[in-house]
Design a protein with these regions (language model features):
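Short, solvent-exposed coil/turn segments at beta-strand boundaries
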Residues: 60-66, 86-97, 156, 191-200, ...
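Secondary-structure transition/turn motif
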Residues: 99-107, 123-127, 162-170, 204-210
Length: 223
């Protein structure tokens, strides 16, 4: 009987030793850390889930939001263009302003937003790109990117992830085509989180002669 118990104990010990390496490969039960993330990066990225969830939505859900901002900056040689939508949110709809700046010329018109569409109080040209306003980015786009740098500051409550530049994703190809950017263009994505309510993404497309920066910010209601 003692010999049987000793063999049973030895079998259990060997099992633990054999399974230990596989257990170390997981940060949490049922969760495997991707090969292109450290454990710290993987856990840190989870704090940006509200932004990832919003970006995945085909039909944007503004419930629980206080404000939404969408902007595009285009620099082509010496020419600079800025387009920005700034919305305050009431229930699922938004009201705010559309601002254009082309060179030194500026114009602002009131706008409202409902059911994925912008409505302008007066004529303006060009209209804001609603594909950018309702930009959809699936989570696997972020999962495929390598992390270049992370930042977390206690003084300003700012958290940030900067991903390595890339030029292969479907998102990049789509935006490169939209803005007629040259082949040598690269794309870099940054996401940020601050003040416990503000989430943002910046997509920077850069070539020798041209630069396009797309930014989205959501501000969640407190409480």
């Amino acid at each position: 009987m003692k010999k049987f118990k000793w063999c049973l104990w030895l079998t259990g010990a060997l099992f633990i030793l054999m399974t230990a390496p596989s257990l170390n490969a997981c940060s949490l039960v049922g969760e495997t850390i991707p090969q292109n993330r450290t454990k710290e990066q993987y856990e840190f990225e989870k704090t940006f889930e509200p932004m990832f969830n919003f970006l995945e939505q085909e039909q944007k859900d503004f419930n629980g939001l206080e404000a939404y901002n969408s902007r595009v900056y285009i620099k082509n040689g010496d020419e600079v263009k800025r387009y920005e939508i700034d919305l305050g949110i009431t229930k699922a709809d938004g009201k705010g302003d559309y601002r254009i700046q082309i060179g030194e010329n500026k114009k602002t018109v009131p706008v409202s937003y409902s059911n994925g569409k912008l409505h302008y109080d007066s004529e303006i040209d060009p209209l804001f790109d609603e594909e950018i306003l309702n930009l959809v980015i699936k989570r696997d786009v972020f999962d495929s990117l390598n992390v270049k740098r992370t930042l977390r500051t206690g003084t300003t409550e700012l958290s940030e992830i900067i991903y390595q530049p890339e030029n292969n994703s479907d998102l990049f190809q789509k935006l490169k085509s939209k803005y007629d950017l040259p082949e040598e263009t690269t794309c870099q994505i940054r996401i940020d989180y601050s003040d416990k309510t503000n989430y943002g993404i910046t997509i920077q497309l850069t070539s020798k002669e041209m630069s396009v920066k797309i930014g989205l910010t959501i501000i969640k209601k407190r409480g």
